[in-house]
Amino acid sequence: EVINNISKCVDGQFPEINKRRHVWSFKNGVFVGKEWMPDKGIYECRFYSYESDKFKCLDPSIIACKYFDQQFDDFSHIERWQDIPTPFFDSVLKYQKFEDEVCDWAYVMGGRLCYDVGELDAWQVIPFFKGIARSGKSTLITKVFKKFYENEDVGTLSNNIEKKFGLSAIKDGFMFIAPEVKGDLALEQAEFQSMVSGEDVSIAVKNKTAMS
């Protein structure tokens, strides 16, 4: 009875803590990756320093999805996002001698991982890096994109994923990665396409009713 009451009651003094996938905290402030600007009619990214008056006006119930033990460098004054210095990420792309347009799209696709499928666009695509061993694929996936969130919030899709219950392992994450994918990926093509397009997918869970 006590467990049932605690799990279902709504109490302002005992709020339910839910991470915001668009909010990250740093030593010097909080970065909000999606904030509605009513005067412009668009969503924007904003950084709030802990000492600023605007930070004090933020909703205190907001929970950051991850804390980075470092200072945040605010480059909001730079007009073109392509001019923001990212030397380490650039080094991987430039080593492959990609054209600037290809490099730009690598950043675009990486940024889309911080949002739900179809949240800000209807492109129905996901990033996929193809290449030989030691070309930088896993470095970008596991050392950059995966670090956007805590390990518990990033699911891993293996090449030999269990056909029936495999998706249940990644359904609750903010992001999923697949570091090694071959031509014999065990995931059904129809399910994969539905995941990419943002359609409802029936997910079988052991000893439970299927979810979507």
Task: Please place each PLM-identified region on the residue numbering.
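Short, intrinsically disordered, charge-balanced linker/junction segments flanking boundaries
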Residues: E1, Q96, K208-S212
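Residues that form generic nucleotide/phosphate-binding pockets
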Residues: N5, C9, S91-Q96, M195
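P-loop NTPase catalytic core of nucleic-acid-dependent motor ATPases
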Residues: V30-F174
